[in-house]
């Protein structure tokens, strides 16, 4: 069973074909709009939508050619329906349903976060079994779930303000780095020369619940930097180090609490921040010390991509989910 997946929720146009029968990714293509939006310091929704329109047909032809298949080979077309930029979502959904109508192929709506939650399954070497705890950590979301079976997700905790990835990007902006700055913060942190120069707070780390807060940490970075008389490259690196240590410490602590609270031994990490080296290193230590199994997506599938939508769509279609009409029903915000 071959499923075409279409991701267009923000500033990446991603398409992929997933084979549900063999549980393998057949092919995928991705176009990133980062360079387009960089000069504006963030994503411009109207530009994002127009760029999706310009690229979707081109990328579809490229994907089918790379996979050496045609539309007649497809069982289903999956597309991101929520959450995301409403215009961008409408472009992807309309494109998917049009293809489905023309070629008489079923379509299925996919929740973007479900795609991220299942993305570690793209690593064929991972033997992930239910149930497990999942941390979804990205620029738009920081949430902990208990996943009992496919489609059975219980929210354990989430950020009450900024997402972790958002805090990384805003810290980068405060320190004069270009968009998107999360990776730059992480890279500069590795060049710190005085790792004890700054001591930043770890909001809600010791709270008994599983919620997060990163707004206060971001404000602490702002106040620390603006009061610093020596705003040198070295001190910028030192502050990036302190910020990253604080943010990752909170994430790892909450993950451990979630595992203890639910009694699970398996932890899945997904979303853009799951590519962070320090996060992976700290969780690897946790795994070795406490005997937990921890799973990540392949590095190239941490950020938004079509592969995770094709995979999630394949699982949904196999579980009898599909669109019943041609209505375009997309949502900017939606819980999983």
Curated annotation (Swiss-Prot):
Might you name a Gene Ontology BP term for this protein? tRNA threonylcarbamoyladenosine modification
**Acyltransferase among keywords:** yes
In the Enzyme Commission scheme, what number(s) does this protein have?
Answer: 2.3.1.234
The cross-references to Pfam families, in alphabetical order and at most eight, read: TsaD
Q: Where in the cell is it found?
A: Cytoplasm
User: What's the superkingdom here?
Assistant: Bacteria
Class of enzymatic activity (EC top level): transferase
Which cellular component terms (GO) are annotated to the entry? cytoplasm
Cofactor(s) recorded in Swiss-Prot or TrEMBL: Fe(2+)
Q: Which InterPro entries match?
A: ATPase_NBD, Gcp-like_dom, KAE1/TsaD, TsaD
Gene Ontology molecular function, alphabetical: iron ion binding; N(6)-L-threonylcarbamoyladenine synthase activity
Signal sequence extent: none
Name the residues that bind Fe cation.
112, 116, 304
Binding sites annotated in the UniProt record for substrate: 136-140, 169, 182, 276
The UniProt catalytic activity note for this protein reads: L-threonylcarbamoyladenylate + adenosine(37) in tRNA = N(6)-L-threonylcarbamoyladenosine(37) in tRNA + AMP + H(+)
Q: How is the cofactor bound?
A: Binds 1 Fe(2+) ion per subunit.
Q: Which UniProt keywords apply?
A: Acyltransferase, Cytoplasm, Iron, Metal-binding, Transferase, tRNA processing
Asked whether the keyword Transport is assigned, the reply is no
As for what it does, the entry says:
Required for the formation of a threonylcarbamoyl group on adenosine at position 37 (t(6)A37) in tRNAs that read codons beginning with adenine. Is involved in the transfer of the threonylcarbamoyl moiety of threonylcarbamoyl-AMP (TC-AMP) to the N6 group of A37, together with TsaE and TsaB. TsaD likely plays a direct catalytic role in this reaction.
Similarity-based family: Belongs to the KAE1 / TsaD family.
| UniProt-recorded name of the protein | tRNA N6-adenosine threonylcarbamoyltransferase
